[in-house]
């Protein structure tokens, strides 16, 4: 059973309940004095607590998407992505599965759209990675047959699971609801983890001598998707949104590559790449590369890109609040000088660095993003 499957969560919960019941039933028999009864009571208590802990842990992981598989959890997934043979012809997007959207009328693509699981190959970066692509119902309707749709890359945090974007943050369901209410134009959503070279947290950097993750997201992915689907290939057709690490990636890639993305939304983002055990040395010892991936430094020292940015935080509960205010103020000063970067924000009064907070922000952020992309 997979780490995020319903079956394993249910099995763990049932095991915890059964062991609790067995403990209650056997407790009178273990009430005597002596080494054996004491060890029996200790063993029953530890066993019950362990199964309850495991059940809650599995449920939390399924809900929040910390780890996507057993190999993720135990750190044994060390495949650095799939190397692409550049001389092999053929499509760069391969559909491996389709599924319905969990809304009314979800069995009909013309009513609810469709989610496709795909594998995206990057000929420039040499990386291949799985993704889920949400195609809105308009994509399947005859009157839209000649229309090109705008698209948004949607990123999780680290390590994250792509399924959490569907089942936890509910991006496709939210997009469907907003379009149906007339608050947003139809978008094609490309939902992914930023961890395309697991288990390493690359922070969407082209690591010297390592995986070229930034190249994959800014060059390979838009072209591959546009070649396979009716999606525009220009920057004005593409936006990017993400939470936590995915939020940093979103902002950075738009600021560094305005020719790829014209709008970016970072939910609870950081503003520079951390260097720790999960990242390793991302910049090959280069202080220049490290500075260029620091978003605050870029605002102070690099030309302002013609992009629209959205950031989010909470006055109480988020550690990035002060940095978010600094970032917003820096962009506002650029605006007053006539620079082309635009800034918007979502600031909650309270909210932690978690899915509950991001679910409150996703509808407004998605509506904002859809309003800044073009379909031609």
Spans of model-derived segments:
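Non-catalytic cap/lid and distal C-terminal segments of serine-dependent acyl enzymes
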Residues: 1-376
């Amino acid at each position: 059973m997979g780490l995020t499957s319903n079956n394993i969560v249910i099995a763990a919960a049932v095991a915890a309940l059964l062991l609790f019941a067995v403990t209650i039933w056997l407790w009178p028999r273990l009430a005597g004095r002596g080494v054996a009864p004491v060890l029996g009571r200790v063993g029953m208590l530890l066993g019950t607590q362990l199964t309850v802990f495991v059940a809650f842990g599995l449920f939390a992981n399924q809900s929040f998407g910390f780890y996507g598989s057993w190999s993720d959890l135990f750190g044994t997934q060390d495949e650095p992505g799939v190397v692409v043979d550049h001389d092999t012809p053929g499509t760069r997007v391969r559909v491996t599965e389709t599924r319905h959207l969990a809304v009314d009328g979800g069995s009909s693509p013309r009513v609810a759209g469709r989610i496709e699981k795909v594998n995206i190959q990057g000929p420039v970066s040499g990386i291949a990675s799985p993704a889920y692509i949400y195609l809105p119902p308009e994509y399947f309707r005859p009157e839209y047959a000649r229309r090109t749709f705008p698209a948004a890359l949607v990123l999780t945090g680290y390590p994250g699971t792509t399924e959490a974007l569907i089942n936890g943050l509910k991006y496709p369901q939210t997009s469907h609801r907003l379009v149906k209410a007339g608050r947003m134009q139809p978008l094609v959503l490309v939902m992914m983890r930023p961890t395309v070279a697991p288990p390493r947290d690359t922070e969407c950097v082209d690591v010297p001598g390592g995986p070229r993750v930034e190249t994959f997201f800014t060059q390979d992915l838009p072209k591959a998707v546009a070649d396979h689907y009716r999606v525009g290939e220009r920057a004005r057709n593409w936006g990017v949104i993400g939470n936590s690490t995915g939020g940093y990636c979103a902002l950075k890639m738009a600021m560094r590559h305005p020719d790829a993305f014209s709008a970016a939304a970072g939910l609870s983002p950081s503003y520079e790449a951390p260097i720790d055990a999960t990242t390793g040395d991302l910049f090959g010892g280069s202080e220049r590369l490290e500075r260029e991936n620091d978003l605050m430094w870029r605002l102070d020292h690099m030309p302002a890109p013609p992009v629209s940015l959205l950031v989010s935080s909470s006055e109480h509960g988020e550690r990035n609040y002060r940095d978010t205010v600094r970032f917003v103020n820096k962009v506002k000063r650029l605006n007053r000088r006539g620079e082309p970067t635009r800034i918007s924000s979502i600031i909650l009064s309270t909210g932690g660095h978690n899915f509950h907070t991001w679910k409150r922000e996703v509808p407004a952020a998605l509506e904002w993003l859809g309003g800044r992309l073009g379909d031609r």
